């Protein structure tokens, strides 16, 4: 059923077995430059040679029980009953264990770093996001009260990544709702500021921001239902009265998200700022010059209402001209804040991560710490494959054609 093995008839009539990966490589190596209404038999070949690299896939071992970590480091993680309860709520998932680097990140980030920096480097799927949000939500949660101000700004280089992490942060925030309520505090609020964030709750505004429609309702472009993963819509009846509320399109689900948990419009971002604000480097650069919106990032506010944390994801992508522009924006924001903030970066492995992050944010190199899994903390699990293709110079086809044809072929094989 998984189509991992194929039966291939040979010229002599025998049946031969070929794995899906081997069949994929055969098709990739035989790739040709195709055009509409032209026979493929005479089309130029695109691949002259290939190499396959297979290596064990290595992940950080997750062996540490959250309860043991709290017991060993109670003075750091659990300085108050609220902090202890938040830790237990965030780590209550059955069977949850933490890796060594996640534990070290939690210990460092659970307290203020006085304008210092922390960069967490690990491979994809290693749990870097948890390494930030676990201690981050403890610090944010203990400062929540009846008033509203942005306590953490999460900055992303790409909108799609912002959407993924927004959903994950929202799910984590909901795990501590009861804990916060038991301590007399409101739920944690999350908001997003990027191109599709409407200014106000009107049908025309949502249309202008290219929100997709489902009948009379509008589909939220940056979040799906946390319960069943269906679309969330802003109902026409709620838009008409200016109520910011999302509802799942699946009738049997019944999930609703109100304005005490999510902020949908720029006007509401100004009126009731969220506890965590998701944005992009481009929007940050634009809004720092906007006197109506710059207060959302802590500019011009008292020191007690300025962000505690600044998260930068995919730090390794900030290179070249794009990286220089991002660094200028971050240093400008840091100067305008004129107040200590804990810089946190998440990244793939970098050669000199601490110096790279210091150059990016302007934080003093002596105050920047890299947290990464040690060699002893890895375990092998599965395998990863890398395929290198060399274009065929004899065909006079560009490497771009090879890239396009291969990109079209691979999704049909995976």
Residue ranges and their predicted role:
Residues 1-89:
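N-terminal accessory nucleic-acid engagement/regulatory domains that precede
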Residues 316-377:
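Post-DEXD/H (motif II) to motif III coupling segment of the RecA-like Helicase ATP-binding lobe
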């Amino acid at each position: 059923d998984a189509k991992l093995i194929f039966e291939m008839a040979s010229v002599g009539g025998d049946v031969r077995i070929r794995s899906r990966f081997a069949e994929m490589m055969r098709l990739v190596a035989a790739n040709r430059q195709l055009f509409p209404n032209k026979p493929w038999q005479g089309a130029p070949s695109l691949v002259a040679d290939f190499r396959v690299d297979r290596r064990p896939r290595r992940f950080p071992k997750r062996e540490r029980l959250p309860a043991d970590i709290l017991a060993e480091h109670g003075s750091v993680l659990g300085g108050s009953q609220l902090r202890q309860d938040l830790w237990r709520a965030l780590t209550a998932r059955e069977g949850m264990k933490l890796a060594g680097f996640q534990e070290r990140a939690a210990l460092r980030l659970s307290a203020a770093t006085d304008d210092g920096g922390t960069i967490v480097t690990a491979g994809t799927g290693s749990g870097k996001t948890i390494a930030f949000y676990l201690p981050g939500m403890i610090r944010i949660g203990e400062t929540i009260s009846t008033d509203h101000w942005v306590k953490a700004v999460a900055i992303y280089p790409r909108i799609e990544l912002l959407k993924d992490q927004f959903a994950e942060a929202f799910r984590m925030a909901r795990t501590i709702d009861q804990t916060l309520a038991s301590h007399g505090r409101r739920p944690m609020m999350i908001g997003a500021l990027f191109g599709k964030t409407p200014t106000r709750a009107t049908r025309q505004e949502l249309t202008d921001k290219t929100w997709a429609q489902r009948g009379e309702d509008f589909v939220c472009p940056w979040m799906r239902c946390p319960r069943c993963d269906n679309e969330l819509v802003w109902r026409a009846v709620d838009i008409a009265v200016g109520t910011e509320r999302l509802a799942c399109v699946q009738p049997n689900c019944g999930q609703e998200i109100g304005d005490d948990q999510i902020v949908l419009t720029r006007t509401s971002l100004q009126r009731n700022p969220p506890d965590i604000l998701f944005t992009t480097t481009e929007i940050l650069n634009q809004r720092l010059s906007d006197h109506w919106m710059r207060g959302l990032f802590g500019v011009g506010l008292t020191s007690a209402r300025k962000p505690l944390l600044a998260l930068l994801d995919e730090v390794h992508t900030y290179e070249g001209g794009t990286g220089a522009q991002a660094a200028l924006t971050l240093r400008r924001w840091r100067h305008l804040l004129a107040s200590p903030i804990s810089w946190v970066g998440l990244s793939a492995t970098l050669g000199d991560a601490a110096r790279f992050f210091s150059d990016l944010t302007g934080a003093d190199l002596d105050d920047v710490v890299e947290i990464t899994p040690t060699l002893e903390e890895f375990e092998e699990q599965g395998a990863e494959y890398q395929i290198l293709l060399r274009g065929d110079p004899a065909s006079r086809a560009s490497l771009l054609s090879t890239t396009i044809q291969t990109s079209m072929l691979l999704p049909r094989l995976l």
